[in-house]
Amino acid sequence: MVDHYQVLGVTRNATKKEVKDAFRRLAIKYHPDKHAQSPEHVRHNATVRFKLVSEAYEVLNDDLKRASYNAGSDSDCFRRTSGSYSNPYGNRGGRAQGSGYGYGYGYSTRNRQASSFSSGFDSTFRYLTTRAFLLNLALAGGLYFAFTAIDTSGETLWKMRNSGKSFEEAMESIEKSKSHKDEG
């Protein structure tokens, strides 16, 4: 994990102004347009560092993102101080597999396709277990039960009061009685 404070060269308690000043200084230093005429490896390193600086600024300049980053990075303290060195820029001298960049975000299309099913399943499962979905499901179940109970009780009441007759037969007898009244 890249330490955004290290990337910008500021302390953890740096103000927004200090973060902004550090970003501007490093953005000018590593901007890809400034290195357009440089050799390939210099351009590549400048582009990678510019992206890291931009990402660090985006996180540290927003109060919510910064608080979230600080909370997450405090729990990663053991990983950062474990004694093994990791290159904060992630480039390993070549390009990352499957992407056009060399800053560690490479992926192969086979892995992406294989994980698309599981991520689709995960997102569907997360949606199905949200409180709003479960409340809507309970409401729909309650309405279904109520309508079924009303329909069943209506049929039961009809059969109790009109034994041996169906609704259609009752309607026919009403029609016959109306026609007898009209004739007579």
Curated annotation (Swiss-Prot):
Pfam families in the cross-refs: DnaJ
GO cellular-component term (any): membrane
Subcellular location: Membrane
Similarity-based family: Belongs to the DnaJ family. C/III subfamily.
Keywords annotated in UniProt: Chaperone, Membrane, Transmembrane, Transmembrane helix
Organism field: Arabidopsis thaliana (Mouse-ear cress)
Domain J: 3-73
Gene3D superfamilies cross-referenced by the UniProt entry: DnaJ domain
Bilayer disposition of the protein: Single-pass membrane protein
InterPro entries: DjlA_DnaK_co-chaperone, DnaJ_domain, DnaJ_domain_CS, J_dom_sf
Domain of life, per lineage: Eukaryota
Annotated TM spans: 133-150
Major localization listed first in the record, in broad terms: membrane
Keyword Membrane applies: yes
Name by which UniProt lists this protein: Chaperone protein dnaJ 72
Role played: Plays a continuous role in plant development probably in the structural organization of compartments.
